Amino acid sequence: MQSLRAAFRRRTPIFLKPYEFSTNVFGLRCRYYSQVRHNGALTDLEYHRVADDTLDVLNDTFEDLLEEVGKKDYDIQYANGVITLMLGEKGTYVINKQPPAHQIWLSSPVSGPKHYEYSLKSKTWCSTRDEGTLLGILSSEFSKWFSRPIEFKKSEDF
């Protein structure tokens, strides 16, 4: 907060740095995202951009899929970086951002919990435990359930 006050006193435009403004019950909140890379990893700003783009693409794909299937007990909710996909008797998927770890976490009724980190080299979310990718595991599981190929496309922004 000190640096924000100092910027106002100096009349320095604070928008030269990557800030995110949001409102909550207590008023305006300002969050600064680091632009420093550590060991070739994503910066905070890059992580949020890529993770949000990924979740947006997944949400759009899930909505299209649920619209095609048309089952009333299937539902999707997407808010605050969390996708909750309820598939009735098949179970519930939860896909969410984990900003402190720069990861996306997947909770699947088929494969269980998994953590994914973004690879700058392959431009995809790779599992921290095996060779799988987020889009690959989702494609595999949904293709089996719906008995047809389901493809999750990457965002052009990646």
Swiss-Prot record:
Enzyme class: oxidoreductase
Keyword Heme belongs to the record: no
Keyword field contains Transit peptide: yes
Signal peptide start-end: none
Record keywords: Heme biosynthesis, Ion transport, Iron, Iron storage, Iron transport, Mitochondrion, Oxidoreductase, Transit peptide, Transport
Subcellular location: Mitochondrion
Cellular component GO terms, alphabetical: mitochondrial [2Fe-2S] assembly complex; mitochondrial matrix; mitochondrion
SUPFAM superfamilies referenced in this protein's UniProt entry, alphabetically: Frataxin/Nqo15-like
GO BP: [2Fe-2S] cluster assembly; heme biosynthetic process; intracellular iron ion homeostasis; iron ion transport; iron-sulfur cluster assembly
GO molecular function, a single term: ferrous iron binding
Known role: Promotes the biosynthesis of heme as well as the assembly and repair of iron-sulfur clusters by delivering Fe(2+) to proteins involved in these pathways. May play a role in the protection against iron-catalyzed oxidative stress through its ability to catalyze the oxidation of Fe(2+) to Fe(3+). May be able to store large amounts of the metal in the form of a ferrihydrite mineral by oligomerization.
Protein name: Frataxin homolog, mitochondrial
Organism: Schizosaccharomyces pombe (strain 972 / ATCC 24843)
Lineage of origin: Eukaryota, Fungi, Dikarya, Ascomycota, Taphrinomycotina
